[in-house]
């Protein structure tokens, strides 16, 4: 596939690095990026320096015969104009744009169509991050929750702790503990090293476990791996940006929400838009303010400003003063592994969340959803099976008969309204939504090839 990526920031470069290793022809365009030459030398891709909204630059980048244009510059307006150019001048078949401005998003149905601004898929990082955070709050104790198949199937990452019924026992004991609930353990990380899950594997405290199940069973299964936490009811948010506002808006009807914003004008505006949230104009590093607002009774402290260092420091302070959980928004991916799992419980990366959404539109085959896991190392894909026993490599075959590379696990599938956890004897049928776990994203081309029907399939 020939793909043009506009914007060589964190998202653009990470997307290029993900796709270039999957036998794609990648061209990266940016106006001024010191990384361009380095990226070209490091990876098998082409770079073009110039304005991403310039017809000449797009022509030089090969827009005339590109299969896909992905506009992820820092400017919504440049992204929109670039997609317009791709549609009007070059007939680029598929156009994806990152749009951040909430005013544009509120009018998306009227604005973004082929009669107006021709964008096929919108990516809104702020909305995606808001979704991610609210999922984590809905499942206290989870490190990551990703939904698939119309939210019927979920992949969940948790830490095993003493108090979980399965801790100290073999995985095979799960069926004895919960005979009416099915799930599959996809991976175990122990002391940072992966362990292949087997029935005889003993679950140890501190293990990071990734499992797949019907969404309705998440909490029951988490209770086997750790002592279930009470629902979060008291939430304190730091920051007044779109993410902080979005999270407060979603939570204020079900939780007691307090929000701290340093800028007085922004605090006033937020107070008017969030009638059930208590908004403070103040500094989250002010210990007196935190004490006055009973930080020791806060269930989860969310540091969601645009400043990584400020987020980290305020979360560390909040935990020291008694907050039960701390979650931070982190822009720099390098920071995440340094801080998560220590004093700070969860770090959320807008870049990784955005990359997941982009990959769902870029992957070959009938891919419906993608989630990056373990901060970009692993991946989960929801893909639809097409064809029949004569035209497909998988339809009509038992899962146990498929020759899957090491590290690829078929976890579950949705057939009609039924969630089926993958077992060796399950036969894949046409139209099944299949959720696959890849411990190494380098195996993505193998999955795309496996699910591609033959040329005779109509």
Swiss-Prot record:
InterPro entries registered for this protein in UniProt: K_uptake_TrkA (IPR006036), NAD(P)-bd_dom_sf (IPR036291), RCK_C (IPR006037), RCK_C_sf (IPR036721), RCK_N (IPR003148), Trk_Ktr_HKT_K-transport (IPR050721)
Its gene? trkA
Gene Ontology molecular function: potassium ion transmembrane transporter activity
Is Ion transport one of the keywords UniProt gives this record? yes
The protein depicted here goes by the name Trk system potassium uptake protein TrkA
Q: What is the purpose of this protein? A: Part of a potassium transport system.
Q: Where does NAD(+) 1 bind?
A: 7-11, 30, 73-74, 98
Q: RCK C-terminal domain spans which residues?
A: 143-227, 368-453
NCBIfam families recorded? PRK09496.1-1 (NF007030), PRK09496.1-2 (NF007031), PRK09496.1-4 (NF007032), PRK09496.3-2 (NF007039)
Q: Which UniProt keywords apply?
A: Ion transport, NAD, Potassium, Potassium transport, Repeat, Transport
Task: Please cite one Gene Ontology biological process associated with this protein.
Answer: potassium ion transport
Domain (RCK N-terminal) ranges:
1-123, 232-348
Residues that, per the record, bind NAD(+) 2: 234-262
Native source species: Haemophilus influenzae (strain ATCC 51907 / DSM 11121 / KW20 / Rd)
GO cellular component terms, alphabetically, are:
plasma membrane
Comment on protein domains: The RCK N-terminal domain binds NAD and possibly other effectors. This is expected to cause a conformation change that regulates potassium transport.
């Amino acid at each position: 596939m020939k793909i043009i990526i506009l914007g060589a920031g964190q998202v653009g470069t990470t997307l290029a690095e993900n796709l270039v290793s999957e036998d794609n022809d990648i061209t990266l365009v940016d106006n001024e990026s010191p990384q361009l030459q380095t990226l070209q030398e490091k990876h098998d891709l082409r770079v073009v320096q110039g304005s991403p909204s310039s017809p000449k630059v797009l022509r030089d980048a090969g827009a005339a015969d590109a299969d896909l244009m992905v506009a992820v510059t820092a400017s919504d307006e440049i992204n929109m104009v670039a997609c317009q150019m791709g549609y009007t001048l070059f007939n680029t078949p598929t156009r994806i744009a990152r749009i951040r401005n909430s005013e544009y998003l509120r009018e998306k149905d009227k604005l973004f169509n082929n009669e107006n601004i021709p964008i096929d898929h919108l990516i809104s990082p702020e909305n995606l991050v808001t979704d991610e955070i609210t999922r984590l709050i809905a499942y206290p104790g989870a490190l990551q929750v990703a939904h698939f198949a119309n939210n019927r199937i979920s992949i969940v990452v948790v830490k095993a702790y003493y108090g979980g019924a399965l801790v100290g026992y073999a995985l095979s004991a799960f069926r004895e503990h919960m005979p009416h609930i099915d799930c599959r353990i996809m991976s175990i990380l122990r002391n940072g090293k992966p362990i292949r899950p087997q029935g005889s594997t003993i679950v140890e405290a501190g293990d990071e476990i990734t499992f797949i199940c019907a969404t309705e069973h998440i909490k029951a299964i988490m209770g086997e791996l750790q002592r279930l936490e009470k629902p979060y009811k008291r939430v304190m948010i730091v920051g007044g940006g779109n993410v902080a506002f979005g999270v407060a808006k979603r939570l204020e009807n079900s939780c007691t929400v307090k929000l701290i914003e340093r800028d007085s004008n922004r605090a006033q505006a937020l107070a008017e838009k969030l009638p059930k949230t208590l908004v403070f104009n103040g500094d989250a590093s002010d210990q007196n303010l935190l004490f006055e607002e009973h930080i020791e009774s806060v269930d989860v402290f969310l540091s969601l400003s645009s400043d990584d260092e400020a987020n980290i420091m305020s979360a560390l302070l909040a935990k020291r003063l008694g907050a039960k959980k701390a979650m931070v928004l982190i822009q720099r991916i390098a920071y995440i592994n340094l801080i998560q799992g220590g004093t700070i419980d969860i770090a959320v990366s807008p870049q990784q969340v955005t990359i997941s959404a982009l990959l769902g539109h870029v992957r070959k085959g009938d891919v419906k959803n993608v989630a990056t896991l373990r901060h970009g190392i692993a991946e989960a894909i929801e893909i639809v099976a097409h064809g029949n026993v004569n035209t497909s490599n998988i339809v009509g075959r038992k899962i146990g008969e498929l020759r899957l590379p090491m590290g690829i696990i078929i976890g579950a599938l949705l057939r009609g309204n039924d969630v089926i956890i993958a077992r060796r004897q399950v036969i894949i049928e046409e139209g099944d939504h299949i959720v696959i776990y890849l411990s190494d994203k380098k195996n993505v081309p193998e999955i795309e090839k496996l699910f591609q029907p033959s040329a005779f399939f109509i």
